[in-house]
Structures are given as C-alpha cells and as structure tokens.
Amino acid sequence: HLALLRYAVEDDEHYTHYCARRGLKMEPIMDFEYSLLTNRDGPLARKEIRDLSELDKYMEILHDDFQLPGEEGGDGVRWHVNPERRIHVYERCSQFSILQRLPTAYMWASPMPRRALEQYHLVLKRCPAQRQQMRDVLVYPDKGRLRPEEQAFVDLLHKEAASTVK
C-alpha cells in the first residue's frame, strides 16, 4: 500500500502530524515550484511572467485539481488567472496535445522528464510570479520493511524524480 501525497511545503506540519497519527511513514520524493508548461515555439516560451495578470490573454489548460482540497474560507482556487480563458481537461495526454497544437496555451506543471518535453515539443519555465513551494512524499504504513516489488517502485520513483526538469 503506497500513496503519493503532494502538498504546499507551508502545510508540512499538518501532513506530518496527520500521517503520524495514522501510523503512516512519509518518505520525501522531491520539493519543487510549479512551472509554466507551454509550446516551445509559442510566445510564452520567450516571455518572463512577473505578474499573473500577464497571463490573462493566454489560454490556461487546467487539470481537475485546480482547487485545493480542504480549504476553509476563501474559494480554494490555487491561483487567480482569467477564468474566461480556461480549458478543463481531465486526461494528461490531451493536455499535452492541446499545448502542442495551441501555442498561446499554458498550464501549471510539476517537474517533468526531459523526454516528455521533447516528445510533445514543450518547455517548462520557472515563473517568478508563482513561487509556492510544493512537496511530494511517498506515504505507506509504518510496519517494517517494504516488499521487494514495493522497494523497487520506490527506488525507481526516486531515480525519475532526480532526473526531471525542474
């Protein structure tokens, strides 16, 4: 039983206590900031975004996780960008296909393997306007050693995380 948990670093204490109370071990995988993912030949590939309002004229591709779970008060929306210029897509390959074919589109993305960026003709750009630190951790019951196949998966996960474009 393995799970990958992603959260804002600022919420680390909450998740650490949550997992400890439930007898779950947390193993860090990587820390990162979301980056702007866009077509390598599009206008955003050459532009540095210093304020999120600069993205208002571009089309945002959103995955189904654009709201943060458990947000009390506020609207739970991760970042406020023009809601009139959004495409909601629930399948990762379709997102990449849209980004590939629509040079004025972008999405917020976690680190990715270089081979995926090359395959879909995309670029991952750091964005000074979005600096939220995120953390991926592997979570599993703290009941001794992992089975060999679980440990092989964990080792592969660490290897892939280390080789991603951040």
Please report, for each region that a protein language model flagged, where it lies by residue.
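Secondary-structure junction motif
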Residues: 6-8, 12, 45-46, 50-81, ...
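Structural motif
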Residues: 6-8, 40, 63-67, 110-111, ...
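Ligand-binding clamshell of periplasmic/extracellular solute-binding protein-like
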Residues: 7-23
